[in-house]
Amino acid sequence: MATLEDKLQELLQPSVEDLGCELWGIECQRSGRFFTVRLYIDKKDGGVTVDDCADVSRQVSAVLDVEDPIADKYNLEVSSPGLNRPLFTLKQFENYIGQDISVHLRVPMFDRRKWQGKLEKIENDMLTLIVDNQPQVLVFGNIQKANVVPKFN
């Protein structure tokens, strides 16, 4: 069964692409009575501007008003993924092999939900992280949330 994020991705991706942006990912989050739909957009040149975010927000709002896929009232947020960009797809993970990432698992592995390490490789739907000089193999489907850990020199 498709998640709300999957449905929104399919519905909104063409509109975002029409504006010259890539729909990097979507997060839906409930906090009490409040519901937030967070869209991350990117551009090939990496230069997402405030105007890009405003344009996408207007376009996406119009689509959501017409299609009405969200039953509750919601707040829409549009931003770039930023330095500690969230990772949503295996293809996105592949772009960050050799870099540090942080992962939150749905189901704990070795009594841990939070892992951080260097992404060494991806085979099928298995990601290998080097954590404390030891390889840890994580199943992509068990990843609840992941992001790049930025390096500051």
Curated annotation (Swiss-Prot):
Subcellular location: Cytoplasm
GO cellular component terms, A-Z: cytosol
GO biological process, any: ribosomal small subunit assembly
InterPro entries, sorted: Ribosome_maturation_RimP (IPR003728), RimP_C (IPR028998), RimP_C_sf (IPR036847), RimP_N (IPR028989), RimP_N_sf (IPR035956)
Keywords: Cytoplasm, Ribosome biogenesis
Source domain of life: Bacteria
Entry-linked Pfam families: DUF150_C (PF17384), RimP_N (PF02576)
Similarity remark: Belongs to the RimP family.
PANTHER family for this protein: RIBOSOME MATURATION FACTOR RIMP
Role played: Required for maturation of 30S ribosomal subunits.
HAMAP family given in the database record: RimP
Name of protein: Ribosome maturation factor RimP
Species in which this protein is naturally found: Histophilus somni (strain 2336)
